[in-house]
Amino acid sequence: MIKITFPNTSARNYAIGTTPMQIAESISCRLAEEILSANVNGEMWDLSRPINENASVKLYKWEDFEGKRTFWHSSAHLLAESLQELYPNIHFGMGPAIENGFYYDVDLGDGVVIKDVDLVTIEKKMQELASKKLSISRQNVTKQNALELFGKKGETYKIELISKLEDGKITVYTQGNFTDLCRGPHLPNTSYIKAIKLTSVARAYWKGDESRKQLTRIYGISFPKKEELSEYLALMEKAKKRDHRRIGKEMELFTFSHKVGRGLPLWLPKGTQLRLRLEDFLKRIQKKYGYQQVITPHIGNKTLYIASGHYAKYGKDSFQPIHTPELGEEFLLKPMNCPHHCEIYKAFLRSYKELPLRLAEFGTVYRYERSGELQGLTRVRGFTQDDAHIFCSPEQVKEELIKVIDIVRVIFCALNFNDYEVQISLRDLNNRIKYIGSEENWKNSEGAIIEVCQEKKIKAKIKLGEAAFYGPKLDFMVKDALGRNWQLGTIQVDYNLPERFELEYVGADNQKHRPVMIHRAPFGSMERFVAVMIEHTGGKFPLWLVSDQVVILPVSENYNQYAEEIAKEFHKRDIRVTIDKRNEKVGRKIRDNELKKIPYLLIIGEKERRNSEISVRKHGKENIGIMKVTEFAEFLKKEVERQMSQWQ
């Protein structure tokens, strides 16, 4: 018999070779119908794969992130099998699950092109194969067998992948007439996939390398119920109207350039103003809580990230090292700010009287995201984190968590993110060996997080086994106007980096002690936060934050001078104003500036100039009426003060 322990610490005994599906069936028939994959001792697992030793087991359903990834990964294989039947000369690249759905990169051969109209035919083939309930089976193969298997098929891309794999750790999955190189896990069979939509076709270089061949990339999404697909498509129609890429272009916030590089946003003047105001907003809040700003370089010696463990984690996702010819050193574009802040802490011998030490930075970091995963500002290769690290004694952890939560809640209130959930990630108590740090510290920090949420009356979901190996964490999941969840604020307790960097402070007992490190980033990254904020508000930012609060629309160029006089008066009062001097009809000017989401449109003509007045129109609404310039300026000032009073 083997002992199976569940996330809630309960345990049952099962026969050796029991599968996750059999475990689910022993609990309830409904659970067996709903589970999609499992996690066994930290490894993702097929439902039909035997378990031969004592294990901690989690069962994943569609509602779980891991369940969706399994579902979409199997959907990518279903797409590949369908393409194999429709295009016999096809060769396959890679087909992963992504954040919302899946894709597969394929080489169709010279002259063969898949267009959007062809997607319907491919969808029908996928639905046909799904309905056949084809079993999906896993097989361990030797490296030589894998090379022979895919070599016979002429799968050159797979051969290239296999050549870099370690022998003894290679698996293939088969469904129907299709076999793919894959780690898994996968669904038990294709019938789980009830609804499919192929969303687009694109071109992508093999492995994201522009010197390699361009492949055809087909994107799609799938669901276990047809009504879920209908709901998703309806949501996507609404989302198109709020797409941050479209609105960002209309509002002149940011752009991208292929010459600069994919996934590297360029912030335009209005977008830069927006970002700087967000940064200033957070800096002012942090100053009240005793944070000190620091600045660190964009690169670091490779040995720094080896010492921190980030190279082991992000090495494959990092850009290639930069070599210095004279000394032979290797530098990396910074993947995280944490190691740099640890070195700042180590610059001096610290006393307990200096703690907590709170270091904050808007630090730009770099990750090599695959080209297929890049999306506007939400997935980029260079992004700025509102990073801060708190170095404190174990006794100070609870108090610091309270203060960080206060900061996060102020930010969410100020920016109208009022609907959010909180998730506490704790240890797997049945697998304590994988965690670093003393039992006492873990108990104290986990207890502190739970107590803080209770004191703050935060209804938090507890996720056992979801903590990082170096400490528990608190995640804030914000729901936007379309009902989508976004992870924005994260608070992480860390015992690992202080240990790796041998951080110390001298205690009241004159002995050296190890501090605790708390990571926090309320925005997450500036790029992603701005994208979420655009889609949540539709670009209608709070008046205190928006780049242009007012636009003046002269009905003809005869009134440009009067517009300049008004703008000069507004500038004296710190009102952000622009003038639309184009030789266009006023109706066109109104429409164009409505798209830019400028809160107030001021129309001026002969009557307004003669009486030193302005005709005021609010974005998205009819005219407010005629006002004196000073009267409107005072009105605007009070509106800004009203909004800011909610969080100052």
From Swiss-Prot:
Gene Ontology BP terms: threonyl-tRNA aminoacylation
A Pfam family assignment: HGTP_anticodon
Gene3D superfamilies for this protein: 3.10.20.30, 3.30.54.20, Anticodon-binding domain, Bira Bifunctional Protein, Domain 2, Threonyl-trna Synthetase, Chain A, domain 2
Reaction(s) catalysed by this chain's protein: tRNA(Thr) + L-threonine + ATP = L-threonyl-tRNA(Thr) + AMP + diphosphate + H(+)
Enzyme Commission number(s): 6.1.1.3
Residues at which Zn(2+) binds: C338, H389, H519
Catalytic class of the enzyme: ligase
Keywords linked to the UniProt accession: Aminoacyl-tRNA synthetase, ATP-binding, Cytoplasm, Ligase, Metal-binding, Nucleotide-binding, Protein biosynthesis, RNA-binding, tRNA-binding, Zinc
Comment on bound cofactor: Binds 1 zinc ion per subunit.
Broad class of where this protein is predominantly found: cytoplasm
Subcellular compartments: Cytoplasm
SMART domains membership: tRNA_SAD (SM00863)
Boundaries of every TGS domain copy: 1-61
Entries under InterPro entries matching the protein: aa-tRNA-synt_IIb (IPR002314), aa-tRNA-synth_II (IPR006195), aa-tRNA-synth_II/BPL/LPL (IPR045864), Anticodon-bd (IPR004154), Anticodon-bd_dom_sf (IPR036621), Beta-grasp_dom_sf (IPR012675), TGS (IPR004095), TGS-like (IPR012676)
Alphabetized HAMAP family for the sequence: Thr_tRNA_synth (MF_00184)
The protein's role, per its UniProt record: Catalyzes the attachment of threonine to tRNA(Thr) in a two-step reaction: L-threonine is first activated by ATP to form Thr-AMP and then transferred to the acceptor end of tRNA(Thr). Also edits incorrectly charged L-seryl-tRNA(Thr).
Similarity-based family: Belongs to the class-II aminoacyl-tRNA synthetase family.
Protein name in UniProt: Threonine--tRNA ligase
Gene assigned in the entry: thrS
